[in-house]
Amino acid sequence: MNIRFDGRTVIVTGAAHGFGRAIALAFARLGAKVHACDILAEELAETLRLCGDAATAHTLDVRDRDAVQRLVAEIVGRDGAVDVLVNNAGGVCGQVGRPIEDISPSDWQVIFDVNLSGAFYMAQAVAPGMKAQGRGRIVNISSGAGLGISLTGIQAYASAKAGQIGLTRQLAHELGPWGITVNNVAPGFVRSNPTTERQWDAMGPEGQKRVLDGIALKRLGAPDDIANAVLFFASDAAGWISGQVLSVDGGK
């Protein structure tokens, strides 16, 4: 299978490190014009350096609907309609697992804002252009927590990622008549960024062994494993696949 994205315009959110950086690099290597977006400007600059001339960096908070609309309008004005959107921005926002009675409304809401509302705002912004050209690919990055439970016990994270999977399925049916596919990649635990490194260390040797014992392949994955799944969903080879969730977790 020869996958290329020459001449295609791709937006990747959460591109400053981890999955997002790997996804942006993968698209850049395959000929795409990549718009790498993140709120972390310093780390985003490193992604841009690695991607080279194939990428443009944009400091963006996906929770800000107006900023999202402005950025997509700018990209469309420069490159034409967006061909591929990868909603990767997300995370636990610095939180750790705590009892439900200790969770404040703001603790709950901030995780929903970045993991679910951000994906909604981005899809909402690119949809008109994709409809106009009669094609498009939206790939949302959720988590195994959205299909089962959160390893870290963060209620809002598991709930927001489950909600993102529901959004994926709903948008697949809504946007399908315009040739737009919407799919979801649900990663297992991957040591891909500072947060997951802290989580891994906090597990200790026994907890780490339990995680590995629960994986069929008995090893953790890498960011490139997630990027490869995204490339497939974004490619012409996946043109008759929509509304699907692909677990990339080494086997559970």
Regions found by a protein language model. Give the residues of each.
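Active-site helix of classical SDR
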Residues: 123, 160, 168
